[in-house]
Structures are given as structure tokens and as C-alpha cells.
């Protein structure tokens, strides 16, 4: 007979099911679409996406789509989370800044690779929920801050990598200056709020940067002093929306 307290708590059927779904997600949605970094794939296998969703939505946790989390914000599609983190080219142990904590899911994935993660969220209620979800999972190397993410978080600078989970009209100067030499900034950028290009900026010296365009994406807008002033209204139902080609 096993000694009292020597066994782990039983694994629930739900936990087993979610773990299997998570493995399929990595194989079918992420690896199959070109994400190859073993650190990123391992991190995506490790973090339970369902823990960052309301109870009523947890059955959708491993769908290949973004999901609403309230306040006009979303938890990003799993593939996009993986692709953006891969674009940061992390080796492990870095200091990372995330703009747009949202649910906290991407910060949890980053925390499996980076040494220290600071994530900024403009909306206080979401910042509180993200912090609670991270704490419930015992993730201790993430600091959640509320503030204007377009201005970064100077107290923690310089950062080895910065990832922005919202689309802005340009790359904020504050984020560029908070990058370490050799650091990478990955962010969606577009001239309007309906669609963006995913851009990677590498700071090659104090005064020089290199920019690459990676993919077409669509994110919620980055609201702030160095982003958009406000969310643009949706197109009226009685007028056709503009189609971008």
C-alpha cells in the first residue's frame, strides 16, 4: 500500500482530453504550417490554453482560431502565437517585453523559453485576469503591468526581444529605443486598422535597424500615445465594406 500523500492527484478526464487536443494542435496547426523551432513547439505543448479562457469557452481552446475574451479583445490563434514567438529567434533565458497581455496565454508560452517576461495590458480587468491565470499555473517569471503598451516599459529595458500583439500605424519609437543591441521587435503594422503586415525589426547598432516583412495578419488595434488614438468604427451594415486585395 502506498504511503499516505505519496501519490500525485488523479488526472481528470478533462485534463487528459485537453492534453491530447494540445498535442494535435501542435502537430496539425503549428508544425504542419512551418513552425520548426523546438523551443517554441515544446512551449506550445506545455501551456494549457484552456486555462486562459472562460469556463464556457474551454471546449474551443484548441480550435484553429482567435477567441473573444471580452472588452473587444481576443486570445490569438495558436498558430499566430507560435509564429510570432518563433520570429523573435529566442535561444532561452532572454528578457522579453510583450505588448498586449490579453488573456496571458502568449506570456505563458514565452515564459517557457525566456528568462524574464514583462507583459503590458491597457485594460485593467484583463491585466488582473491574466495575472491570476499565470499565478494559478505557478508561472513565476512573468510580470503583468497595466499601462500604455505603445510606450513600452522603460524600467525593464533594454529587452532582448519585444513582441506586440496589436496592430499599429507604425513601429513606436519608444519600443525601438528599449531594444538591446541585437534585439528583435516583432509587430503588426498597417496604415489602417483592418489589416497589417507582420514586421520584424532588428536593432543592429545604437543608430541602425534592419526591417523585414514576414506575413499578412489582422490584429486588434494598438491604442496609445504611439499607436492609434481610438478604435475605428465598424463599416455600416448598409454599405459594402472595403475589400483589400
Swiss-Prot record:
One of its GO terms (biological process) is methylation. It is found in: Cytoplasm. Its EC number is 2.1.1.77. Catalyzes the methyl esterification of L-isoaspartyl residues in peptides and proteins that result from spontaneous decomposition of normal L-aspartyl and L-asparaginyl residues. It plays a role in the repair and/or degradation of damaged proteins. One of its GO terms (molecular function) is protein-L-isoaspartate (D-aspartate) O-methyltransferase activity. The gene is pcm1. It catalyses: [protein]-L-isoaspartate + S-adenosyl-L-methionine = [protein]-L-isoaspartate alpha-methyl ester + S-adenosyl-L-homocysteine. It comes from Rhodopseudomonas palustris (strain HaA2). The active site is at 76. This is Protein-L-isoaspartate O-methyltransferase 1. GO terms for cellular component: cytoplasm. Its main location: cytoplasm. Belongs to the methyltransferase superfamily. L-isoaspartyl/D-aspartyl protein methyltransferase family. Keywords: Cytoplasm, Methyltransferase, S-adenosyl-L-methionine, Transferase.
